Swiss-Prot record:
Role according to the record: Through its interaction with host SGS3, acts as a suppressor of RNA-mediated gene silencing, also known as post-transcriptional gene silencing (PTGS), a mechanism of plant viral defense that limits the accumulation of viral RNAs.
Protein family (similarity comment): Belongs to the geminiviridae protein AV2/V2 family.
Protein name: Protein V2
Disulfide partners: none
Keywords: Host cytoplasm, Host-virus interaction, Inhibition of host innate immune response by virus, Suppressor of RNA silencing, Viral immunoevasion
Stored InterPro entries: Gemini_V2, WCCH
Membrane-spanning ranges: none
Length: 115
């Protein structure tokens, strides 16, 4: 869960609680598919906990809370249909193979020589 060789131990009790909360949320995050509302909400909550400035934390929490109140429990596992613009989403890192219209397909031509 927490590796003392890789990470420093938090200096305050609040820092320790935040570290445990983030580790727990990362485990919960693994139970959701990356293209669901629940996954996005958990990522938002992790960003709320990681914010250092009180103003930034308040702004992120207000955004998170408004999204959470607007969602029913059944919607958390449903795929998102709206597109978001954040670069850290796994669904933005997928490469889509698209067939280009201007490139003709190659066809196999049978041998037409007669013996």
């Amino acid at each position: 869960m927490w590796d003392p060789l890789l990470n420093e131990f938090p200096e305050t009790v609040h820092g320790f609680r935040c570290m445990l909360a983030i580790k727990y949320l990362q485990l919960v995050e693994n139970t959701y598919s990356p293209d669901t509302l629940g996954y996005d909400l958990i990522r938002d909550l992790i960003s709320v906990i990681r914010a250092r400035d009180y103003g930034e934390t308040s702004r992120r929490y207000c955004h998170f809370h408004s999204r959470l109140e607007g969602a029913s429990p059944a919607e958390l596992r449903q795929p998102l249909y709206g597109s978001c613009c954040c670069p850290h989403c796994p669904r933005h890192q997928k490469t889509n193979v698209v067939k280009q219209a201007h490139v003709p397909e190659a066809h196999d031509v049978p041998d037409v020589q007669k013996p």
